[in-house]
Amino acid sequence: MGQKIHPIGFRLGITADHKSCWYADSKRYPETLQEDRQIRQYITKNLSNAGISDIRIERKADQVDLAIHTARPGVVVGRGGSGIEQLRLGLQQDLGGNRQIRINVIEVQRVDADAMLIAEYITQQLERRVSFRRVVRQAIQRAQRAEVKGIKIQVSGRLNGAEIARTEWVREGRVPLHTLRADIDYAYRTAQTIYGILGVKVWVFKGEIIPGQEEIPMPVPSQTPRRQRRRQQFEDRSGEE
C-alpha cells in the first residue's frame, strides 16, 4: 500500500533515483555499503548546522564522488574552500586507505519545500520546547509560500509532555502516496526532548512527473497579494482549534 511503504523506495527506478550509484561484487558489497553509511554519518555529524538535505555517492574504481545538497553552502565550503578540504581529509582518515574523494556542494534553492529541511526545522523547535501545534503550523505556512502542491506532517510521542504518547498529523493540499508518477519528498527525524523521543515525518508533494517529459522547476512565487490571501486563510482555520 502506498500509505505504508517508504515513499522514495516505492518509486525507485520510476521517478526516484538511488542515493548511492556504484557496483561491487558479492565479496566487497557489504564493506562498500558500510562505507557509504559511514560517510553519511560523518558528514551529518560534522555539518549538523549546515542544513544538509541529501548526500549522493558515486564510486569509480578508487574514486568516491560526493554530492552534498545543503541549504547553507557557505558553511560547507568555508573560507577559501578550507571547509571542503578539511572535510575531505577527515573522510580519508575515517575511512582509511588512499582512495581519492571529490566533493561537490549543491545549494538547495527551495528550502521551505524540502522535506528533510522541514523535518530538521521542526525537530530543532521541539527540542527547544516549543508547542508542536505552533511549529507544525509555521512549517506548513512556509511550505505553502513555496507553492508546494501538498504537505503532510506527522508528530508522534509524548506531545507537550503528555503522560500518554499519541500521534497527530496535519495535511494541507494533495499528497497522493499511491500515485507512482507523483513527486513525493519524504523525511523522518527524531527530536530528543526531556520527555522522551518525538518522531517527525514529513511528506511533500511537488507535482507529477510524466514519463518522457522533463521536470519543469516551479518558479519562486512573486505575487504578493496571492501569498497574503493564502496565509490569512490558513491562520484563520488553525486559530479555531
Swiss-Prot record:
Checking InterPro entries in the record gives:
KH_dom, KH_dom-like_a/b, KH_dom_type_2, KH_sf_prok-type, Ribosomal_S3_C_sf, Ribosomal_uS3_bac-typ, Ribosomal_uS3_C, Ribosomal_uS3_CS
Q: Which GO terms describe its cellular component?
A: cytosolic small ribosomal subunit
Composition bias type Basic and acidic residues, residue spans? 232-241
The UniProt record lists the KH type-2 domain at 39-109
Q: Give the UniProt keywords, A-Z.
A: Ribonucleoprotein, Ribosomal protein, RNA-binding, rRNA-binding
Xref: Pfam families: KH_2 (PF07650), Ribosomal_S3_C (PF00189)
Q: Which GO terms describe its biological process?
A: translation
Region of interest (Disordered), residue spans: 214-241
Annotated function: Binds the lower part of the 30S subunit head. Binds mRNA in the 70S ribosome, positioning it for translation.
State the NCBIfam families in the record.
rpsC_bact
How is this protein organized at the quaternary level?
Part of the 30S ribosomal subunit. Forms a tight complex with proteins S10 and S14.
Protein's UniProt name: Small ribosomal subunit protein uS3
Question: In which organism is this protein found?
Answer: Rippkaea orientalis (strain PCC 8801 / RF-1) (Cyanothece sp. (strain PCC 8801))
- Quick one: which gene encodes this? rpsC
